[in-house]
Amino acid sequence: MRTENTATLNLMWGALILEELARLGVQHVCMAPGSRSTPLTLAAAKQTKLKRHLHFDERGLGFMALGLAKASSAPVAIITTSGTAVANLYPAIVEAWLTHVPLIVLSGDRPPELLGCGANQAIVQPAIFANYAQQVNLPTPDAHIAPQMLLTTLDEAVANQTRPVHINCMYREPLYPSELTATILDSESPYLKPLQTWLQQARPYTIYGKREQLSHPSEDAIMRFVHGKGVIIAGTLTPEQDPQQLIALSQKIGWPLLTDAQSQLRQHPAAIGNIDQLLQHPKARNLLQEADRVLVFGGRLLSKRLIAYLAEQNWHSYWQVLPQQDRLDPSHNAKHIWHANAAQFAQLNWYRSSSANWANTLITYNDDLHHLFVRNIDQGEFGEAQVIRAIANTRPLEQQLFIGNSLPVRLYDMYAPVSCCTATTYTNRGASGIDGLLATACGIAAHQGKPTSLIIGDLSQLHDLNSFAIARSLTSPLVIIILNNDGGNIFNLLPVPNEELRSDYYRLSHGLEFGYAAAMFNLPYNQVDNLADFQTCYNEALDFQGASVIEVTVSQHQASEQIAALNLWVKQS
């Protein structure tokens, strides 16, 4: 029988869920409006331990949660109503699963008797995320189900979790209590009597021990591993892994450190950051082919040339270091995968290689490319690579950088400048989609309030126009730099059979500008077509307490023609 008690118990379960998630380390909850999720929404509204973020579009909401989780290194909860609202989270959940980002989806759902019978807004929600989330299906709230069961279910699903969890929450009507009391979890409630101790504490009901993070080789194995010519590769690494320790490791062993755009070390002067270009430099490539052992930190490398190098080289020893058990080696050459924090592994008792400094000439080649890029990009024609290098050199210690997919992140990987300091860098390179990039950047910016720059292509921004609504709510600097080359011009770099096919089926020129979109959301907007204007607008935007848009207008072929010219110079070096 549906009574006021149903609404009260629904709300109590919602409050238990939100309270336990807060105790499990959740700091942020992202919410979209909807009726069936009312018990969760009202509980979140009363929960003082969580920072609330609201958005009307679940796709953008999911990506905002992804950004918050990346920036906070903590799980983030997402509340949605039933039906396609849940399905709209799928792209963000896929990205989070592939990159080990813990998102906790709390989806409101119809009770069992309203499923599969034509009831409104009712779909099969359990397992909707298939391979990309751990699934928990909660029953409808019932006074005969002990509240301890609810808490232990949450604890087992969420504790130590590094990937998405989907908690499906069925609720019967009525969903709205006649009044909202000051305290939902009232210790005087008979239903909560078994939780008296828990209510007086601040810890989870069940505490799970931390999983052992570090596996490491023996000293003898290390001695044998470093006995020869080797390279160290820094792939995707989070700031929490303290990638700077890899610089010290490289210097101790005497092997070069080759750095990916996502390593936090791409611009470090002691690293070989221009590895993508060096692998088409004849002398550098010949030298690198002498290596017979490799130590890879992280995975998901950007450079196809570096990926091919790892696949084609005849390695005597191939070690990879990952923070969790995973398979992130498309070459299938890795023979030992160690589960450890990068910094911890780098601080083991390493020995100097018997072939220390074998590749020191790479430093000269890397420096030569640095000077080439200064002459031909910084001092050359206005374009996308020039803007990206200018961003990377502007106030790096003051800000964080989110680099969009497709062409922007590749240009950064190929041509980022050498710098004494680097902004903390984020990407979405799990599934490498061009959706949700602005929303992710908004989440990153919202966590600490640190100035944030987003570099995004025009098609990516068209995908995520709704997230301008999230951006306008920010109170810290978010500079949205849209590189508008009128279409998907990364396809200029790919062997499409002819120009007509490229234009009609791949590039999809649109002729659109973003000024009216920015105005619709009341965001400051500038359009630039030269470096001086860009730098003026960019520095002003970094000081503006909120989001702003800089649209960089470039020709369709500027980047691809510049890349071709630089490739030719490098190959002839």
UniProtKB/Swiss-Prot annotation:
Catalytic activity entry: isochorismate + 2-oxoglutarate + H(+) = 5-enolpyruvoyl-6-hydroxy-2-succinyl-cyclohex-3-ene-1-carboxylate + CO2
Which SUPFAM superfamilies does the record associate with it?
DHS-like NAD/FAD-binding domain (SSF52467), Thiamin diphosphate-binding fold (THDP-binding) (SSF52518)
EC category: transferase
Cofactor(s) for this protein?
Answer: Mg(2+); Mn(2+); thiamine diphosphate
List, alphabetically, the Gene3D superfamilies matched.
3.40.50.970, TPP-binding domain
For this entry, list what GO says about its biological process. menaquinone biosynthetic process
Q: What is its EC number?
A: 2.2.1.9
UniProt entry keywords in alphabetical sequence: Magnesium, Manganese, Menaquinone biosynthesis, Metal-binding, Thiamine pyrophosphate, Transferase
Quote the cofactor binding remark: Binds 1 thiamine pyrophosphate per subunit.
Please give the superkingdom of this protein's source. Answer: Bacteria
Pfam families tied to this protein: TPP_enzyme_C (PF02775), TPP_enzyme_M_2 (PF16582), TPP_enzyme_N (PF02776)
Tell me a Gene Ontology molecular-function term this record carries: thiamine pyrophosphate binding
What the entry lists under InterPro entries is as follows: DHS-like_NAD/FAD-binding_dom (IPR029035), MenaQ_synth_MenD (IPR004433), MenD_middle (IPR032264), THDP-binding (IPR029061), Thiamin_PyroP_enz_TPP-bd_dom (IPR012001), TPP_enzyme_TPP-bd (IPR011766)
Q: In which pathway does it act?
A: Quinol/quinone metabolism; 1,4-dihydroxy-2-naphthoate biosynthesis; 1,4-dihydroxy-2-naphthoate from chorismate: step 2/7; Quinol/quinone metabolism; menaquinone biosynthesis
CDD domains listed in its UniProt record? TPP_PYR_MenD, TPP_SHCHC_synthase
Sequence similarity: Belongs to the TPP enzyme family. MenD subfamily.
Relate the assembly described in the record: Homodimer.
Per the entry, what this protein does is: Catalyzes the thiamine diphosphate-dependent decarboxylation of 2-oxoglutarate and the subsequent addition of the resulting succinic semialdehyde-thiamine pyrophosphate anion to isochorismate to yield 2-succinyl-5-enolpyruvyl-6-hydroxy-3-cyclohexene-1-carboxylate (SEPHCHC).
This protein's name: 2-succinyl-5-enolpyruvyl-6-hydroxy-3-cyclohexene-1-carboxylate synthase
